[in-house]
Amino acid sequence: MTRTQKEKMLAGEMYNAADPEIQADLLAAGAWLKRYNSTLGDSAEQWHLFLREGLGEVGPGAVIRPPFHCDYGFNISIGAHAYMNFNCVILDVAKVTIGDGTAIGPAVQIYTADHPDDPEQRQAGLQLGRPVRIGKHVWIGGGAIILPGVTIGDHAVVGAGSVVTRDVPPGAKVMGSPARVRG
């Protein structure tokens, strides 16, 4: 049986992003984001209700301050009492898991979308995704960028403006571009 492009995307395989089913999911997420981002002056409780409508899993007390941007939403799982400040971006072609009690500063970008090295595959519109896992009680400073396939361990700290290109051990403090373990 042949897999659909969406099934390939969700399995982390090479897929064609121009596929009509995938494009329909992008449009649906765009409509949800338009409504969510118009709730800027609403309460955290109202935001939480909207998040449960548009994201895959939302733990109790989780907050994402608008404006917020993502590709699909259904690949995002945010734990209990996790907090994400405004202007964050999650490119969620693969699963993004944010653990309980994690705090994410403004303008953080989390990418799961990746592209093949082969220029012909890129020109054909092929891409793939690699999941990002962020543990419990992690602090990610404003403007940090988390690249595809990265796992950040529980209780880790990522400095503002850091570019995280590889896994971060539990309890580690990383900063810089590329991010490196510091003191």
UniProtKB/Swiss-Prot annotation:
Q: What Gene Ontology cellular component terms go with this record?
A: cytosol
Q: Which Pfam families match?
A: Hexapep, Mac
- Class of enzymatic activity (EC top level): transferase
Q: Which CDD domains match?
A: LbH_MAT_GAT
Q: Which GO terms describe its molecular function?
A: acetyltransferase activity; O-acyltransferase activity
Record keywords, A-Z: Acyltransferase, Nodulation, Plasmid, Repeat, Transferase
The superkingdom listed in its UniProt entry is Bacteria
Q: What is its EC number?
A: 2.3.1.-
Recorded hits in Gene3D superfamilies, A to Z, give:
Hexapeptide repeat proteins
Give the protein's function.
Acetyltransferase implicated in the O-acetylation of Nod factors.
Q: Which family does it belong to?
A: Belongs to the transferase hexapeptide repeat family.
Put simply, this protein is called Nodulation protein L
